[in-house]
């Protein structure tokens, strides 16, 4: 996927759900993976011509694992002239050594988001951008149906009352295959996750299930995504731009 196509998908999502307003200070949550680095590129590119002016910075929560080398990400942020903050934590140690969690993902995500949002507020940002793409939204819906018995997926835009922060997901119209293509084309400095359960989670199961359904029923993933968009899910804002 070329940058221009990425910017088109990103702007469409932002306009559809009014994700960005004049004067916003937006922090991009950077895990070091392909998705978050693609989002950084997209918002940096959009910032140059989007009619509503906004500031942009990047932030990573370091879980404390050995070998988590962010030098490539640091260099990229310097090249893009985007301020970059790394939050050092012991979350990995707390999860696996202190608490010895057998199913760590939920607690880890909660602690990571807490650390991220706290620093985002300290940096003076009013919005935080997460790099969830179309596949993530569909997979979350599958997980919610299988394990919670409800039709749900996370919203394009969510206001966190307690933190007085708005979460936005500008990559919601971008497919993971396109993110992979963008990563390869632009040689993004992806940092491999050092987490010991990476690739062995319920989300990975959902990813394989969706891929299988899409192979057996071509277009199934797109149809599931449309069902989510049209599903009147609680907490989802209405689209500002009607098609």
Kindly give the residue locations of the regions a language model identified.
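ATP-dependent adenylation/nucleotidyltransferase module used to activate substrates
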Residues: 1-139, 147, 177-185
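Electropositive phosphate-/nucleotide-binding environments in soluble metabolic enzymes
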Residues: 4, 37, 67, 110, ...
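Solvent-exposed amphipathic alpha-helical surface segments
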Residues: 17, 46, 50, 213-216, ...
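Residue-level detector of flexible, active-site-proximal loop/helix-junction positions
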Residues: 65, 91-93, 158, 174, ...
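Short, solvent-exposed polar/charged micro-motifs at secondary-structure junctions
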Residues: 95-98, 202-204, 233-236
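A short, charged, Gly/Pro-tolerant segment at domain boundaries
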Residues: 215, 219-243
């Amino acid at each position: 996927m070329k940058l221009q196509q990425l910017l088109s998908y990103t702007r469409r999502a932002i306009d559809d759900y009014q994700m960005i307003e004049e004067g916003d200070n937006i922090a991009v949550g950077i895990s070091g993976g392909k998705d978050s680095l693609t989002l950084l590129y997209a918002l940096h590119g959009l910032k140059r011509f989007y009619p509503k002016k906004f500031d942009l910075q990047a932030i990573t929560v370091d879980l404390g694992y050995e070998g988590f080398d962010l030098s490539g990400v640091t260099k990229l942020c310097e090249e893009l002239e985007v301020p970059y903050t790394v939050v050092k934590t012991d979350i990995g140690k707390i999860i696996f050594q202190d608490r010895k969690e057998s199913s760590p993902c939920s607690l880890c995500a909660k602690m990571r988001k807490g650390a991220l949002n706290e620093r985002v507020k300290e940096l003076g940002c009013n919005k935080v951008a997460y790099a969830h793409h179309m596949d993530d939204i569909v997979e979350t819906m599958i997980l919610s149906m299988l394990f919670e018995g409800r039709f749900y997926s996370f919203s394009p835009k969510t206001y966190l009352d307690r933190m007085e922060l708005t979460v936005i997901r500008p990559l919601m119209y971008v497919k993971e295959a396109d993110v992979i293509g963008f990563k390869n084309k632009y040689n993004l400095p992806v940092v491999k996750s050092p987490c010991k359960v990476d690739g062995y989670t319920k989300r990975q199961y959902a990813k394989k299930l969706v891929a299988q359904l899409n192979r057996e029923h071509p277009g199934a993933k797109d149809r599931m995504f449309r069902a989510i968009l049209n599903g009147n899910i609680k907490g989802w804002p209405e689209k500002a731009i009607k098609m």
